[in-house]
Amino acid sequence: LVHHALDGRPLTRLINTHSHSDHIGGNAALKAAYDCEIIVPAGLHAAIADWDEDALLLSPLGQQSARFQHDSLLGAGTEIEMGGLNWQALAVPGHDMEALAYYNPEQRILISGDALWENGFGVIFPELLGEADGLTHAQATLEMLSRLPIDIVIPGHGRPFGEVDLAFERAFRRVNQFRNNIEQLAWHAIKVIVSFAMLERRSIAHADFPDFILGLPFAVDVNARFLDMPHDAMVARVERELLLVNALKLQDGKLLAPG
């Protein structure tokens, strides 16, 4: 995919917004293929240098990423040139407490990572892990970003989008829902993590699905902390709701990820 997008051009730098596996999982392969410089948010230095799988949320979420070493760090408040434009690095804690977004005021473009999507934002993991007041930080991040003149957002997931005011309305509404109902956030997070783990696994025997879910430390811990559902009830509800939205498919005794 990257080779096709480059169309013969060199890849000289790889700049991350945050450290979750779906954003850093290709770093090692791209470094090997293109010998590009890897730049990460400054707050991630120790976690990446020591390859702390708990801090990187690899082990807790049942996810994988090939180990890599970064070449340089980027701190909030600094500027970096990308694509002939100067971008401001902005601290956007919430989904990831060390995350950065990148903003170009001349073209009014925001590279938001998972701090803002067209319909919401990434799971607020710190709130659920008891590490920080993630929802308060997410609210403050949205308030800060909403004050910027923005015409186009390039999110960490989904297509670039305009109509930014509507996206902020949806995001604020969602963060308020979660603040008023932490159990809703907890359940949403469990489903997201199981869906993501299944995208990597691709298929699993239906009979093995309970052990698969209960092998995800995050799902078990969040259920115990916020929901207190019996394990069999949690597994059955996850399966039922993911099948309902076509995030899973049951076929020939197997549960299959889409695609």
Set out the residue ranges of the language-model regions.
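Surface-exposed alpha-helical segments enriched in charged/polar residues
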Residues: 3, 143-146, 240
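Residue-level marker for the onset of beta-strands and adjacent loop->beta junctions
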Residues: 76-78, 98-100, 244
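Soluble or luminal CAZymes and related metallo-dependent hydrolases
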Residues: 72, 133-137, 230, 234
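Histidine-centered active-site/metal-ligand motif
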Residues: 18-23, 95, 99, 157, ...
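Active-site HxH/HxHxD metal-binding segment of metal-dependent hydrolases
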Residues: 2-82
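C-terminal regulatory/interaction regions
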Residues: 187-259
